[in-house]
């Protein structure tokens, strides 16, 4: 986990090309997840990286949100920023789906 928790900083570092936002809350209703996604997108624009959101609610598994456009060919430029244009899965599924993607 990143030591610096200032606005605009990535929460986690070490995955090149990705701007990682991480949230841990009591509950994670869809409206709140959509708000967090907006934060992830804004942060990724500042760092010139792809946005990804990791979140977990109490007594729930970790979930990951990332842009669906990454899996389209040709890839939309820029990627649509809306929450409706995302995929959600567990961390292993995210990694399996994106590990071979080029960051462009």
Residue positions per predicted region:
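Catalytic phosphate/metal-binding cores of nucleic-acid and nucleotide-processing enzymes, i.e., regions
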Residues: 1-104
């Amino acid at each position: 986990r990143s030591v610096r928790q200032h606005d605009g900083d990535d929460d986690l570092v070490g995955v090149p090309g990705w701007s990682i936002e991480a949230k841990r809350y009591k509950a994670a209703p869809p409206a709140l997840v959509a708000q967090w996604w907006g934060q992830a997108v804004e942060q990724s624009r500042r760092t010139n990286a792809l946005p990804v959101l990791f979140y977990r609610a109490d007594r729930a598994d970790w979930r990951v949100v990332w842009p669906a456009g990454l899996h389209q060919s040709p890839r939309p430029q820029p990627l649509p920023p809306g929450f409706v244009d995302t995929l959600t899965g567990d961390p292993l599924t995210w990694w399996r789906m994106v590990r071979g993607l080029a960051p462009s």
